[in-house]
C-alpha cells in the first residue's frame, strides 16, 4: 500500500546538497501510483515579483487592490520553469484549477491572474514558476533514503511565513527544534 503525500510538505534533510533542493520545503500537489508532483514554496526568483509578471502579461491592477504585488515569485521546481503555478485558497473555479484539499487549490491559467488583479483584498496567493515531479515510486525511494521528512501541509507556513523561515518553521512543526541533531544516516533495529 502506498502512503499518499498529497497535501503534505516534503522537508529537505540538512544534508541535501543540490542547491535547488537544499533547505527546501515542497508542497505536494499530487501523489499516486503513477508518481508525484509538487511546488517548492521557499526559494524566490531574484528580482521577479507578481507585479512584474502581471505587467509582462499586460494585466492591469485595480487601484484599490491591497495585495502586495511586490511579493516575490517562487522557484517552483526545475520542470517547466516558464510555466506559472498559483497556490491559493479561492473557492472559485478557474479554467485549469485543481482542488488539492478542502482549503487549497492550484491553478495554471491566466484567468486567475486577471481575477487577482481585480480583487480588493486578495489573500493566500503563492505564485511559482516551474514544478517538481517524481516518477512512479521515486518519491517513496527518496523518503526511504532519508532525503525528505514529511508532514501534513500547514497553510500558515505556505502563505504567512516569511520565505527565509519556511524550512525552519516546517522543521519545528514536526518537533525538530535543533536541526544540527539530525543525521541523514538510516537506522536499523
From Swiss-Prot:
Pfam families: DUF179. One of its GO terms (cellular component) is cytosol. InterPro entries: AlgH-like. Belongs to the UPF0301 (AlgH) family. This is UPF0301 protein bbp_491. It comes from Buchnera aphidicola subsp. Baizongia pistaciae (strain Bp). The lineage of its organism: Bacteria, Pseudomonadati, Pseudomonadota, Gammaproteobacteria, Enterobacterales.
Amino acid at each position: 500500500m502506498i502512503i499518499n503525500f498529497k497535501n503534505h510538505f516534503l522537508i529537505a534533510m540538512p544534508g541535501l546538497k543540490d542547491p535547488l533542493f537544499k533547505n527546501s520545503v515542497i508542497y505536494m500537489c499530487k501523489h499516486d501510483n503513477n508518481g508525484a508532483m509538487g511546488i517548492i514554496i521557499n526559494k524566490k526568483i531574484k528580482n521577479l515579483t507578481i507585479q512584474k509578471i502581471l505587467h509582462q502579461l499586460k494585466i492591469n491592477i485595480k487601484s484599490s487592490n491591497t495585495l502586495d504585488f511586490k511579493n516575490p515569485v517562487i522557484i517552483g521546481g526545475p520542470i517547466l520553469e516558464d510555466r506559472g503555478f498559483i497556490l491559493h485558497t479561492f473557492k472559485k473555479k478557474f479554467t485549469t484549477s485543481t482542488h488539492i484539499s478542502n482549503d487549497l487549490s492550484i491553478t495554471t491559467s491566466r484567468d486567475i491572474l486577471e481575477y487577482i488583479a481585480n480583487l480588493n483584498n486578495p489573500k493566500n496567493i503563492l505564485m511559482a514558476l516551474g514544478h517538481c515531479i517524481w516518477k512512479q515510486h521515486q518519491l517513496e525511494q527518496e523518503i526511504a533514503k532519508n532525503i525528505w521528512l514529511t508532514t501534513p501541509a500547514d497553510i500558515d507556513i505556505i502563505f504567512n511565513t516569511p520565505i527565509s523561515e519556511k524550512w525552519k518553521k516546517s522543521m519545528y512543526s514536526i518537533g525538530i527544534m535543533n536541526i544540527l541533531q539530525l543525521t541523514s544516516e538510516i537506522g536499523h533495529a
